[in-house]
Amino acid sequence: MSKTFKLHSAFQPSGDQPEAIRRLEEGLEDGLAHQTLLGVTGSGKTFTIANVIADLNRPTMVMAPNKTLAAQLYGEMKQFFPENAVEYFVSYYDYYQPEAYVPSSDTFIEKDASVNEHIEQMRLSATKALLERRDVVVVASVSAIYGLGDPDLYLKMMLHLTQGMLIDQRSILRRLSELQYVRNDQAFARGTFRVRGEVIDIFPAEADDEALRVELFDDEVERLSLFDPLTGQLLRTVPRFTVYPKTHYVTPRERILQAMEAIRAELAMRRQSLLASNKLLEEQRLAQRTQFDLEMMNELGYCSGIENYSRYLSGRGPGEPPPTLFDYLPADGLLVIDESHVTIPQIGGMYRGDRARKETLVEYGFRLPSALDNRPLRFEEFEALAPQTIYVSATPGNYELDKSGGEVIDQVVRPTGLLDPLIEVRPVATQVDDLLSEINLRAAIGERVLVTTLTKRMAEDLTEYLEEHGVRVRYLHSDIDTVERMEIIRDLRLGEFDALVGINLLREGLDMPEVSLVAILDADKEGFLRSERSLIQTIGRAARNLNGKAILYADKITPSMARAIGETERRRERQQAFNLAHGITPQALNKKVTDILQLGDGPVRSRTKGARGQRAAEPHPDYHTLSAKQIEQQIQRLETQMYQHAQNLEFEQAAALRDEIHILREQFKNAS
């Protein structure tokens, strides 16, 4: 029998949580397709959802609008369900440049990507968990609506091994090669296998710290055991084991041969069409590229950019939706969309941008028309595939409200008794000097401040001005990547600086109890950055602090401001009434600052102990005395260290070394 969910928490549901849990569960059991949970900041929305999952015992996908929030949710769910399968499914690209063609300058840009192996392993682990068990929570980003290998083919390709099974060594090795595993008797890494006499060691693609040892005797599987690939220590013997493919995109040989025939037929038709339109260059280009891909598929079973032929490989018809993570989710699965007012529009926008780029590639002979079917889901396809759905947001959008028939499950009362921030409106004329004095007041008592501006220029100028006046301040902008952004937020919580200035980056889901003041400059400039939802979300960043306050700098009260202030006051009054009725004194949150990049308690496992305290590079090393040859050697040495740190998820050290290498390269140019 499949394991059931077991929720671990020191707390019992309280405040609005018990009623919200009851209504959500009732709705799901009554077959409601859409429900909306309006949960304010700090009301324990994740805990409510965790209780619903545990009570109903249904496999669940939680979708977040970005990797940062997905990582935060993954960490929380890991703590709630340490005995169950909590998985993480986001895009595995650290860097991704899709292939594109710019007709105006006749520039073709090749696809270029850097895959994060660790996230790839977590994606494989997520699909494996969905196929094998029911006690699964997959925390995903919008990456879940992009094409993935067909689950039916994926299941067909698996290698099942059982103790006592009759199979010769050659057959096992051939099957492993079909699963795209690579033989490597020297470096034993994820997705490889090695052979020593009658013993085959396999490092499963979805595993992080366990490998399989297959011991054969006279063409029979004598013993199957799991061991630690790092130390070689035997962990336990198992009666059976399933080896999953190295990638989601593996395809049986017969399907590849069928696909090749269909691709040849489409190529012939497309060539005729291009020649009839007198597009000779495009016809030649398409024939050359496609025939090269066909040759690669025939010899190796795959080719670069094989995803462009996914329609044929998955056996789907023209225009049919591609297989995605939703195809792996059981029929009675549950979908939770976090920060739905952001996530839903994102899902709706993915298809069109992808389509526009691919149409250009098809028109100019870089791809066959069938490449258009390698795409994310259209919004209506997503709606058709989505199981019973709970939308979670402090500010639900019109779509969610419409889908749930205008009925909203309120979770406004916080168990901690914390009130929504007090709101003050102050004049714009003195906003900068007034802000400076407010920051100094907060810094003196060890509290933090968030400041949101309307433009990048304003944010830069304000940061510079505050720095000149002795404020420890940082500026958060869109050019900062996910990892660095999480480091900045962690440093703010740790007190490395007192104020953080940003534009549209200080809204949904950021969990910072140390922030006691949110300052919104130019709050009376109507627009999406100063809409009712944006203002409520931004004000909510101070709702986790006992002394939470929001200052809106404005010369007039706009309709959006009036609605945001009214809604915040409504929530504040409801919380005060609850506190009074139950004798609750508001308590400060003491949430420990964890390194969110380690994604909960697993499955990340750092290979180096105590590396955190090491210095990645000298603060200001002097390279001027080195020769060009010595600089070259130093670059190679630092690059090796950088990749090692990145592999161990020690991003601060890797980033410091990257900057060091950049300085050295400049020096190398000058020296040579």
UniProtKB/Swiss-Prot annotation:
A Gene Ontology biological process term: SOS response
Main subcellular localisation: cytoplasm
Family annotation (InterPro entries): Helicase/UvrB_N (IPR006935), Helicase_ATP-bd (IPR014001), Helicase_C-like (IPR001650), P-loop_NTPase (IPR027417), UVR_dom (IPR001943), UVR_dom_sf (IPR036876), UvrB (IPR004807), UvrB_inter (IPR041471)
Location of the motif Beta-hairpin: 92-115
Record GO terms (molecular function): ATP binding; ATP hydrolysis activity; DNA binding; excinuclease ABC activity; helicase activity
Compartment(s) where it occurs, according to its Swiss-Prot or TrEMBL record: Cytoplasm
One Gene Ontology cellular component annotation held by this UniProt entry: cytoplasm
Residue span, UVR domain: 632-667
Residue ranges of every copy of the Helicase ATP-binding domain listed in the record: 26-183
Region (Disordered): 601-623
Domain of life of the organism encoding this protein: Bacteria
Domain Helicase C-terminal: 431-597
Keywords: ATP-binding, Cytoplasm, DNA damage, DNA excision, DNA repair, Excision nuclease, Helicase, Hydrolase, Nucleotide-binding, SOS response
Residues given in the record as ATP binding sites: 39-46
Pfam families: Helicase_C, ResIII, UVR, UvrB, UvrB_inter
Flavoprotein keyword on record: no
Transmembrane segments: none
Keyword Disulfide bond applies: no
NCBIfam families assigned to the protein according to its UniProt record, in alphabetical order: PRK05298.1 (NF003673), uvrb (TIGR00631)
Domain commentary: The beta-hairpin motif is involved in DNA binding.
Family classification: Belongs to the UvrB family.
HAMAP family per UniProt: UvrB (MF_00204)
Quaternary state and interactors: Forms a heterotetramer with UvrA during the search for lesions. Interacts with UvrC in an incision complex.
Function noted in UniProt: The UvrABC repair system catalyzes the recognition and processing of DNA lesions. A damage recognition complex composed of 2 UvrA and 2 UvrB subunits scans DNA for abnormalities. Upon binding of the UvrA(2)B(2) complex to a putative damaged site, the DNA wraps around one UvrB monomer. DNA wrap is dependent on ATP binding by UvrB and probably causes local melting of the DNA helix, facilitating insertion of UvrB beta-hairpin between the DNA strands. Then UvrB probes one DNA strand for the presence of a lesion.
Protein name per its UniProtKB record: UvrABC system protein B
